[in-house]
Amino acid sequence: MQLNSTEISDLIKQRIEQFEVVSEARNEGTIVAVSDGIIRVHGLADVMQGEMIELPGNRYAIALNLERDSVGAVVMGPYADLAEGQKVKTTGRILEVPVGRGLLGRVVNTLGQPIDGKGPIDNDGFSPVEVIAPGVIERKSVDQPVQTGYKAVDSMIPIGRGQRELVIGDRQTGKTALAIDAIINQKDSGIKCVYVAVGQKASTIANVVRKLEEHGALANTVVVVATASEAAALQYLAPYSGCSMGEYFRDRGEDALIVYDDLSKQAVAYRQISLLLKRPPGREAYPGDVFYLHSRLLERASRVNAEYVEKFTNGEVKGQTGSLTALPIIETQAGDVSAFVPTNVISITDGQIFLETDLFNSGLRPAVNPGISVSRVGGAAQTKIIKKLSGGIRTALAQYRELAAFSQFASDLDDATRAQLEHGERVTELMKQKQYAPMSVADQSVSIFAAEKGYLKGVELNKIGDFEASLLSYMNSEHADLMKTINETGDYNADIEGGLKAGLDKFVETQTW
């Protein structure tokens, strides 16, 4: 066989032309130090702030400190088997979590991975955990209510859709109970809920999930969990993950409610990370950007206008506004609301609900102190009937607390003062409410109407609860149409007032409590 040199050269040329250089450019570095969940990496170039760094064993760390010759990163998960000299590489990605309707009814960790044993989640995509909040032009004023189901809150400290209302108090004052009841009350309202548990015991969270399931609210709720035993990085990021899951509904013209339980533990986790990264400590050893930690999170709770929703959905959803309402929880130490983190969050939010240990221990539950609790924007969103009827409730309670303190020193009181004290006592008693028993707008309206129009005057203090229960049972059976109208419209006019008065007059005649 004779070889033709021309054919050989043509074949070689053809092979050379077809040859493709396949090269993978990887930004790789070496771990130079590992301690307490923090790794220091040398040799990485082009790293972004907050970028995910791939570690051995299919784990990730997040780059938080970008220094001249090294990168400080916090490990997302266990770190005991990491060692100096191991290779790591950049991913070019910022941390993202799954979002969508498939998360409703599920319990997930900070990274959006299911931990409830119900199989994989059918998500609609991914969203970055850190998102810039909507601007001023994209927002709409708050004018629709979020009913918590608590008389004390809905009448005196109303919450609107898109508002940030802080729940603050010492440990064991009913903060979580109030937030969980608010979630339970949304099961028929169309508001989707996200409950973020930060730094709590796994048994406590399991109990919350069980209660939500028992009351039919879990199907409407996403539970995001970062327990006390998990890495500080996961506790720090959990609220941001939950917020991204809630924003999915807001940006599509729906309403969502998110509870952060609690942001004190998130601040402690962030302080731990910052100190380990050797960032300079400030007041109470918190880093200088702890205000920004919470402000950038809570500013994402907002009501957005129809133009924003239409633009976000590429015209699929038109003429609908969306909202994300936040109920951040802060735990105080011995009632000290002037500590660093509480004052920060008070200044960021649109109002606060103060829960007091003394009130809780005296049997007043929810233990709301109406004197120092406030809602800065909720008044514009309050249901008409409750707004009209509850005007005197806050005044009555404030005057009662003042007079009760004064009457301890005064021996004889005039009739007007005594009447005020008695009215205040009855209103205080009426504001008591059992856990897991949120009330409808109509039920609240009937109770407040009875207090405002003097129907409690002849009722003994220890019978107020029985009086209310019997009254609501009577009104819902004998005046079902009136109650249905109030629930559907929320209006207050002469017909509704006449119907309530007639119903109460007839009930009082029966003396069946």
Curated annotation (Swiss-Prot):
Q: What GO molecular function terms would the record report?
A: ADP binding; ATP binding; proton-transporting ATP synthase activity, rotational mechanism
Keyword ATP-binding in record = yes
Q: Which enzyme class?
A: translocase
Q: What is its EC number?
A: 7.1.2.2
Q: List the disulfide bonds.
A: none
Identify the residue position(s) of the site Required for activity: S373
Query: What membrane topology does the UniProt entry give?
Result: Peripheral membrane protein
Q: Does the keyword Membrane apply?
A: yes
Protein residues bound to ATP: G169, D170, R171, Q172, T173, G174, K175, T176
GO cellular component assignments: plasma membrane; proton-transporting ATP synthase complex
Please give the catalytic activity noted in the UniProt record: ATP + H2O + 4 H(+)(in) = ADP + phosphate + 5 H(+)(out)
Per UniProt, which keywords does this protein have?
ATP synthesis, ATP-binding, Cell inner membrane, Cell membrane, CF(1), Hydrogen ion transport, Ion transport, Membrane, Nucleotide-binding, Translocase, Transport
Q: Which Pfam families match?
A: ATP-synt_ab, ATP-synt_ab_C, ATP-synt_ab_N
Q: What is its main location?
A: membrane
Under the heading InterPro entries, the entry gives: ATP_synth_asu-like_sf (IPR023366), ATP_synth_asu_C (IPR000793), ATP_synth_asu_C_sf (IPR038376), ATP_synth_F1_a_nt-bd_dom (IPR033732), ATP_synth_F1_asu (IPR005294), ATPase_a/bsu_AS (IPR020003), ATPase_F1/V1/A1_a/bsu_N (IPR004100), ATPase_F1/V1/A1_a/bsu_N_sf (IPR036121)
Cellular compartments annotated:
Cell inner membrane
Look up the domain of life of the source. Bacteria
Subunit field text: F-type ATPases have 2 components, CF(1) - the catalytic core - and CF(0) - the membrane proton channel. CF(1) has five subunits: alpha(3), beta(3), gamma(1), delta(1), epsilon(1). CF(0) has three main subunits: a(1), b(2) and c(9-12). The alpha and beta chains form an alternating ring which encloses part of the gamma chain. CF(1) is attached to CF(0) by a central stalk formed by the gamma and epsilon chains, while a peripheral stalk is formed by the delta and b chains.
Similarity comment: family membership: Belongs to the ATPase alpha/beta chains family.
- Function according to Swiss-Prot or TrEMBL: Produces ATP from ADP in the presence of a proton gradient across the membrane. The alpha chain is a regulatory subunit.
Designated name of the protein: ATP synthase subunit alpha
